[in-house]
C-alpha cells in the first residue's frame, strides 16, 4: 500500500534517494558499489 501513500521508508546511505521496496534499494546500491552480478554470455564483460 506504500505505493499509493507515497511512503518510501528505505533510504540509500550513500545518497538522498528513498525507495518503496527494499529490493529496489538493493538494486540501486549497485550504482555505488560497482557490483555487476550478471555476466554476458557472449563476451567476458559483466
Swiss-Prot record:
It comes from Pholcus phalangioides. It is found in: Nucleus. GO terms for biological process: segmentation. Krueppel is a gap class segmentation protein. It holds the Pfam family zf-C2H2. A zinc finger (C2H2-type) spans 1-4, 10-32, 38-46. GO terms for molecular function: DNA binding; zinc ion binding. The keyword Mitochondrion does not apply. Keywords: Developmental protein, DNA-binding, Gap protein, Metal-binding, Nucleus, Repeat, Zinc, Zinc-finger. GO terms for cellular component: nucleus. It comes from the Eukaryota. Its main location: nucleus. This is Protein krueppel. PROSITE patterns: ZINC_FINGER_C2H2_1 (PS00028), ZINC_FINGER_C2H2_2 (PS50157). Belongs to the krueppel C2H2-type zinc-finger protein family.
Amino acid at each position: 500500500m506504500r505505493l499509493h501513500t507515497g511512503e518510501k521508508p528505505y533510504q540509500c546511505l550513500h545518497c538522498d534517494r528513498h525507495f518503496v521496496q527494499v529490493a529496489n534499494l538493493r538494486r540501486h546500491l549497485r550504482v555505488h558499489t560497482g557490483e555487476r552480478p550478471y555476466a554476458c554470455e557472449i563476451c567476458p564483460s559483466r
